[in-house]
């Protein structure tokens, strides 16, 4: 039987440098990845280095609210 909330949750990772550069309108968009995390192992916000196709480099992608 399920107890409480699900352990695995779906999260969205967003490029932090695209968000900062959005004011200058240098990038064509904002890179986002959809993945899952285990709430018991990682209770805090997740940050991963992923490739951003708009910045053309590996940047830090942080977890955002839905």
Curated annotation (Swiss-Prot):
One of its GO terms (biological process) is translation. One of its GO terms (cellular component) is chloroplast. It is found in: Plastid, Chloroplast. Keywords: Chloroplast, Plastid, Ribonucleoprotein, Ribosomal protein. GO terms for molecular function: structural constituent of ribosome. The keyword Ribonucleoprotein applies. It comes from the Eukaryota. The keyword Disulfide bond does not apply. Pfam families: Ribosomal_L33 (PF00471). InterPro entries: Ribosomal_bL33 (IPR001705), Ribosomal_bL33_CS (IPR018264), Ribosomal_bL33_sf (IPR038584), Ribosomal_zn-bd (IPR011332). Its main location: plastid. Belongs to the bacterial ribosomal protein bL33 family. This is Large ribosomal subunit protein bL33c. The gene is rpl33.
């Amino acid at each position: 039987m399920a107890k409480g909330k699900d352990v695995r949750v779906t999260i969205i990772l967003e490029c932090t440098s695209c968000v900062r550069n959005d004011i200058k309108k240098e990038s064509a968009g904002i890179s986002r990845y959809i993945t899952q995390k285990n709430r018991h192992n990682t209770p805090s916000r997740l940050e991963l280095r992923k490739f951003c196709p708009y910045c053309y480099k590996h940047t830090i992608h942080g977890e955002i609210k839905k």
